[in-house]
């Protein structure tokens, strides 16, 4: 990846400062971007630690997704620098700490202040859902505050490297914010999980306490699964209406992001720039800021190369400088993607021909974005977008799993159960038949039908992937296959063969 300084030092473009924190994969340090003088936070992800936790491929994938996000209330990722030992993730620096500490210090907030935070959170969550990314670990500790007390959702995507079905084993945080379907290991599509967590956060903002809290974990789980909590009498009628609609145990009956946006409590004093979702990234990059362009050109970069790099979303010294300068200008002048910016964006996008939009979407998918239709649906909310990843079926979950296991057997795929409806698999065209290893009833038993081979048997001709079954809002079930490692083309061959074997999808 581009990003190394001119002296060969991977971080030569930055002056490294003190350590801000230490996480599971490594440290986070403050740094100064030398060309612009702006501060950034550099997350140092240790490759050895990531590999030992089998997270390497997922971390890379989620970073690619996060690099495309451009939203005022999501921490911006400016640059990713790869070295043999570490991955350096250069991100927006915010200095006012976590929303968690803010709540602890101030206690319950007045409705106006709580609503302002909540509007920003929902806007950021909605943006990610529209781009087919779910956080699954939203909590005040992951919500940072900048110098103007604006919310920044942190680790969006990076926190989502946890395997489905492994939430309690892999999450180092508290399950207080987790939805019932998550801690129960039930099927879930994703967006509803974040709505529940946002409901817990809203409760904490308005009440200064958590709705579900107990030192005894089994008791805590019982409260969450039963939706057992109390609403304080000081809450306004509209707040008392919204919170219970978010904390509905059945995810299919839970309020949606769009319905939250339309709720009377939410719409009070809603800023103009949050009144509609921001443009998709593919459209945002078409609008370039002339003043910022000139600033970067004055640093010695070629204008044509800079514009081309920005349109193609390339990462290099010039584009990193551009976005650092642009973000700082928006913060200090018109605010976070303020109304003026939106109006100029709208007028610019109105001139974009329909033929341009699909190409832009395609370009972004090639740069690591999750493939999804509807990139150009500017005015559609998250609830209008259909989550159509994977294969859909109305068959019973057990029937689907039975057919999946039959298909895996026919293809000589080894598998191991890691969740109720989640398994990790390994396939190599050269493997001999493993039919004798499969369960005759084709269902999840106490043991898994995976052959544990030693390292000598692993080769570049082996594909590792995961299968997860989800439930969608329209009472369908969705089967998703996700490559973990191995040749991409070999994985596509497997998917094609797998499709021909299935009988219920």
Swiss-Prot record:
<dbReference type="Pfam" id="PF00069">
    <property type="entry name" value="Pkinase"/>
</dbReference>
<feature type="domain" description="Protein kinase">
    <location>
        <begin position="14"/>
        <end position="266"/>
    </location>
</feature>
<dbReference type="InterPro" id="IPR017441">
    <property type="entry name" value="Protein_kinase_ATP_BS"/>
</dbReference>
<dbReference type="InterPro" id="IPR028375">
    <property type="entry name" value="KA1/Ssp2_C"/>
</dbReference>
<keyword id="KW-0539">Nucleus</keyword>
<keyword id="KW-0547">Nucleotide-binding</keyword>
<dbReference type="InterPro" id="IPR000719">
    <property type="entry name" value="Prot_kinase_dom"/>
</dbReference>
<dbReference type="InterPro" id="IPR015940">
    <property type="entry name" value="UBA"/>
</dbReference>
<feature type="binding site">
    <location>
        <position position="43"/>
    </location>
    <ligand>
        <name>ATP</name>
    </ligand>
</feature>
<dbReference type="GO" id="GO:0106310">
    <property type="term" value="F:protein serine kinase activity"/>
</dbReference>
<keyword id="KW-0808">Transferase</keyword>
<protein>
    <recommendedName>
        <fullName>Serine/threonine protein kinase OSK1</fullName>
        <ecNumber>2.7.11.1</ecNumber>
    </recommendedName>
</protein>
<dbReference type="GO" id="GO:0005524">
    <property type="term" value="F:ATP binding"/>
</dbReference>
<comment type="function">
    <text>Serine/threonine-protein kinase involved in sugar signaling during germination and seedling growth. Negative regulators of sugar response complex (SRC) in alpha-amylase gene promoters, thus relieving SRC sugar repression in a MYBS1-dependent manner. Required for MYBS1 and AAMY3 accumulation under glucose starvation.</text>
</comment>
<dbReference type="GO" id="GO:0005634">
    <property type="term" value="C:nucleus"/>
</dbReference>
<keyword id="KW-0418">Kinase</keyword>
<dbReference type="InterPro" id="IPR011009">
    <property type="entry name" value="Kinase-like_dom_sf"/>
</dbReference>
<feature type="domain" description="UBA">
    <location>
        <begin position="287"/>
        <end position="327"/>
    </location>
</feature>
<dbReference type="InterPro" id="IPR008271">
    <property type="entry name" value="Ser/Thr_kinase_AS"/>
</dbReference>
<keyword id="KW-0723">Serine/threonine-protein kinase</keyword>
<dbReference type="Pfam" id="PF02149">
    <property type="entry name" value="KA1"/>
</dbReference>
<feature type="binding site">
    <location>
        <begin position="20"/>
        <end position="28"/>
    </location>
    <ligand>
        <name>ATP</name>
    </ligand>
</feature>
<dbReference type="GO" id="GO:0004674">
    <property type="term" value="F:protein serine/threonine kinase activity"/>
</dbReference>
<dbReference type="Pfam" id="PF00627">
    <property type="entry name" value="UBA"/>
</dbReference>
<feature type="active site" description="Proton acceptor">
    <location>
        <position position="137"/>
    </location>
</feature>
<comment type="similarity">
    <text>Belongs to the protein kinase superfamily. Ser/Thr protein kinase family.</text>
</comment>
<feature type="compositionally biased region" description="Polar residues">
    <location>
        <begin position="347"/>
        <end position="361"/>
    </location>
</feature>
<feature type="region of interest" description="Disordered">
    <location>
        <begin position="347"/>
        <end position="372"/>
    </location>
</feature>
<dbReference type="InterPro" id="IPR001772">
    <property type="entry name" value="KA1_dom"/>
</dbReference>
<feature type="domain" description="KA1">
    <location>
        <begin position="456"/>
        <end position="504"/>
    </location>
</feature>
<keyword id="KW-0067">ATP-binding</keyword>
């Amino acid at each position: 990846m581009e990003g190394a300084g001119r002296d060969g030092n991977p971080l030569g473009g930055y002056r490294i400062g003190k350590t801000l924190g230490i996480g599971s994969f490594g440290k986070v340090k403050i740094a100064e971007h030398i060309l612009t003088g702006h501060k950034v936070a550099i997350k140092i992800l240790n490759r050895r630690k990531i590999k030992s936790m089998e997270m390497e491929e997922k971390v890379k994938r989620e970073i690619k997704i996060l690099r495309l996000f451009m939203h005022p209330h999501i921490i911006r990722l400016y640059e990713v620098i790869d070295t043999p030992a570490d991955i350096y993730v250069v991100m927006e620096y915010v200095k006012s700490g976590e929303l968690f500490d803010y709540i602890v210090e101030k206690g319950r907030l007045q409705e106006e202040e709580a609503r302002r935070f909540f509007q920003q959170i929902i806007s950021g969550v909605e943006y990610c859902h529209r781009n087919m990314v779910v956080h699954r670990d939203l909590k005040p500790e992951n919500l940072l505050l900048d110098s103007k007390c604006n919310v920044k959702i942190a680790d969006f995507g990076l926190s989502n490297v946890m395997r489905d079905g492994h939430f309690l084993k892999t999450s180092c945080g508290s399950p207080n914010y987790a939805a019932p379907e998550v801690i129960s290991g039930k099927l879930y599509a994703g967006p509803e999980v974040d709505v529940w967590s946002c409901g817990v956060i809203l409760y904490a903002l308005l009440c200064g306490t958590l709705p579900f809290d107990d030192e005894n974990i089994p008791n805590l789980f019982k409260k969450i699964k039963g939706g057992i909590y109390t609403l304080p009498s000081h809450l306004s009628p509209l707040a008392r209406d919204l919170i219970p609609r978010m904390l509905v145990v059945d995810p299919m009956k839970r309020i949606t992001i769009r319905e939250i946006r339309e709720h009377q409590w939410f719409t009070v004093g809603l800023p103009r720039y949050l009144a509609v979702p921001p443009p998709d990234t593919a459209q945002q990059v078409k609008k370039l800021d002339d003043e910022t362009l000139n600033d970067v050109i004055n640093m010695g970069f070629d204008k044509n190369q800079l514009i081309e790099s920005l349109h193609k979303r390339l990462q290099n010294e010039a584009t990193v400088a551009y976005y650092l300068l642009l973000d700082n200008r928006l913060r200090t002048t018109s605010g976070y993607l303020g109304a003026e910016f939106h109006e100029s964006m709208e007028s610019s996008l109105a001139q974009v021909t329909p033929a341009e939009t699909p190409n832009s979407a395609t370009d972004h998918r090639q740069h690591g974005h999750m493939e999804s239709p509807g990139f150009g649906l500017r005015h559609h909310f998250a609830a209008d977008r259909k989550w159509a990843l994977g294969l859909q079926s109305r068959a019973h979950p057990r029937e689907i799993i039975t057919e999946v296991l039959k298909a895996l057997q026919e293809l000589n795929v080894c598998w191991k159960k890691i969740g109720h409806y989640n398994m990790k698999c390994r396939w190599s065209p050269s493997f001999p038949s493993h039919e004798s290893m499969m369960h005759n009833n084709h269902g999840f038993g106490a043991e898994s039908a995976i052959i544990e081979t030693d390292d000598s048997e692993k080769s570049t001709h082996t594909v590792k992937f995961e299968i997860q079954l989800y439930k969608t809002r329209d009472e369908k079930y969705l089967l998703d296959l996700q490559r973990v490692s191995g040749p991409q083309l070999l994985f596509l061959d497997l998917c094609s063969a797998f499709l021909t074997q299935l009988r219920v999808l």
